[in-house]
Swiss-Prot record:
Example GO biological process: nucleotide metabolic process
Location of the active site: D76
Protein name: dITP/XTP pyrophosphatase
Biological role: Pyrophosphatase that catalyzes the hydrolysis of nucleoside triphosphates to their monophosphate derivatives, with a high preference for the non-canonical purine nucleotides XTP (xanthosine triphosphate), dITP (deoxyinosine triphosphate) and ITP. Seems to function as a house-cleaning enzyme that removes non-canonical purine nucleotides from the nucleotide pool, thus preventing their incorporation into DNA/RNA and avoiding chromosomal lesions.
Reaction equation(s) it catalyzes: XTP + H2O = XMP + diphosphate + H(+); dITP + H2O = dIMP + diphosphate + H(+); ITP + H2O = IMP + diphosphate + H(+)
Domain of life per record: Bacteria
Species of provenance: Mycobacterium leprae (strain TN)
Matches recorded under PANTHER family: INOSINE TRIPHOSPHATE PYROPHOSPHATASE, INOSINE TRIPHOSPHATE PYROPHOSPHATASE/HAM1 PROTEIN
Amino acid sequence: MALVTKLLVASRNWKKLAELRRVLDNAGLSGLTLVSLNDVVPFDEAPEAGATFEDNALAKARDAFAATGLASVADDSGLEAAALGGMPGVLSARWSGSYGDDAGNTALLLAQLCDVPDERRSAAFVSACALVSESDEVVVRGVWPGTIAREPRGYGGFGYDSIFIPDGPGLGGRTVAQLRPAEKDAFSHRFRALTLLMPALRVLAMRT
C-alpha cells in the first residue's frame, strides 16, 4: 500500500477551510498534505440533507473519497440555541432561506431571540468531523458552549461568530468575531472535534 500523502478537506468555504487547515497544520501532521475541493477535479456533491451534523459530515466525506480516491475529512457545523429547541442546528447556513447569507441568518436569529432574557440565551457551536479512507470511517463531535449576544460585535470569523459569546478562560466576554484566530483555534468546536479525530489522522499519516 502506498504512503498516504494527501488529505482532502471536503470544503469550498475558504474561511472554514483556512480554519481547518490552521488547526491541522498546528497539530504537526507532517505525513499529510492538505488539499481542498478547489484542488481536485469537480464532482457532484450531495446536498446537506441529513438530520444531524454527523449525517452531513459523513455524507460529504464519503462523496469526496468516492470521487477522488483521497482520504477525506469533512465538517458540518452550526449553532444550537437552547431557547429555540436546538435550532437552527443543521439549518444554520440557510436559516434565513438563502444558503450562506451570514448577515441574514444572524439578523433573523437575533429577532427570534429579542424577548429572551439573558439567563435563557445559552447556546453552543457544534462541529461534526468525519474521516473516510480506504480502511476506515470515523465521525466525532466537538461542542463549544456559550451564549447569544444581543447585537453583533466584531468583524472576524464567519457565520454566527459575531453574536456568539463563548465560554472559556481568558476570553473576557468577547464574541468569536472579536477573538484572534489563534484564540479561536485553541477553543473552537472544530478544534475540539479535530482533537478527537487526531488519533485516526495520525494513523493515516503513518500508514504504508
